[in-house]
Amino acid sequence: MQHHHSVDASGVFSGPVGADLRAKLASDENVLAALQVDLSADLRFVSGWVVVTSRRLLARAPGATVSRDWALAPGLALKLQHHGGVGTLELHNPQERVAFWRFTLGHHPQALRLVQRFEQQVERGA
């Protein structure tokens, strides 16, 4: 089984975390954008990741031992904001916020790219 990734996500895919993420991808699932998140919900420096694929959004919150995923579907939205040097990426369904991740602003360009690719895939009806 071979995986073809559409972006250079080498930072996200290195080490044991990368092996775990690669194991979660279907053989025909492409990574379109990746974001390293480096702040926990209580603003401690801990690593995590958020990835948009051709089918879904996958994430491992900083400090978490398991990842979560959401199928890309109409009604899902990613909202990006920053305040005081901290970026926040929020995932919303039509009713509520279902997840959020925090990161230092050095990762803001990755976050912008991730939101853009997410929106493109949702519009296409992934």
Task: Label each region the model flagged.
Residues 55-57:
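Structural motif
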Residues 26-44:
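The phosphoinositide-binding surface of pleckstrin homology
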Residues 2-13, 20-23, 40-47, 60-126:
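Acidic, Ser/Thr- and proline-rich intrinsically disordered linker/docking segments
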